[in-house]
């Protein structure tokens, strides 16, 4: 990243898979040190830790280590719809006690959530969380945009999106359409038209090449709670 001419006044973020650091042969601490230098030597501002519920406790060490290096730290809890709300509240309370996580993200990993489950999830998090909340939606059932906008209505501050929904399997919330909706709701000063040429030209070609996006297979994977990697393997 240091070799790139990056725009200034932009916060740059990366996401790491907690499971890979926890399972590193040299230990979790060594894994963190191998990947990250001190913030003062890096263009990265934010590190987001993606984790499953079973690894939450082990993420505290990773989060504290990254904070000591000078990074802002977010947590991304995956497969949120498979966690009952009492367990979710307990997890959020634990993470709150760490005092080092700036934003608590939840991921609709199977793309099978709806506005009701989004609402229930946000309420469960808010009951134990004093800071910002984020959502990472998947578009298996075509609900990513609606779920993202609903999450904002329910009080979520951070919404993930990519151009043309670029992402694994069915993809994620489409940035160009999300910005149109947000601008229409007067939630900020955005200019979605500026993205249209990039989406229609460069990213359209990338989508044809890498073939991400909705299909009946990904829809059915959401219906039956099957991880999208199994569909990709098919």
What are the language-model segments listed below?
Residues 1-234:
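Catalytic cores and adjacent flexible loops of soluble metabolic enzymes
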């Amino acid at each position: 990243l240091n070799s790139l001419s990056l725009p200034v006044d932009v916060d740059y973020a990366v996401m790491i898979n907690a499971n890979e650091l926890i399972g590193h042969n040299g230990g979790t601490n060594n894994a963190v040190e191998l990947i990250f230098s001190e913030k003062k030597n890096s263009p990265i501002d934010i590190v987001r830790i993606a984790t499953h519920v079973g690894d939450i406790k082990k993420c505290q060490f990773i989060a504290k280590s990254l904070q000591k290096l000078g990074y802002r730290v977010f947590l991304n809890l995956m497969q949120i719809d498979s966690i009952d709300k009492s367990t979710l509240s307990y997890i959020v309370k634990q993470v709150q006690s760490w005092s080092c996580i700036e934003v608590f993200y939840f991921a609709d990993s199977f793309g099978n959530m709806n506005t009701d489950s989004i609402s229930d999830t946000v309420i469960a998090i808010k009951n134990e969380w004093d800071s910002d909340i984020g959502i990472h939606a998947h578009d298996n059932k075509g609900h990513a945009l609606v779920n993202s906008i609903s999450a904002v209505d329910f009080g979520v501050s951070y919404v993930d999106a990519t151009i043309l929904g670029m992402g694994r399997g069915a993809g994620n919330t489409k940035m160009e359409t999300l910005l149109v909706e947000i601008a229409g709701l007067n939630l900020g000063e955005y200019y979605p038209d500026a993205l249209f040429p990039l989406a229609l030209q460069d990213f359209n070609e990338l989508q044809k090449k890498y073939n991400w996006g909705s299909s009946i297979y990904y829809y059915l994977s959401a219906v039956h709670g099957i991880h999208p990697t199994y569909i990709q393997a098919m």
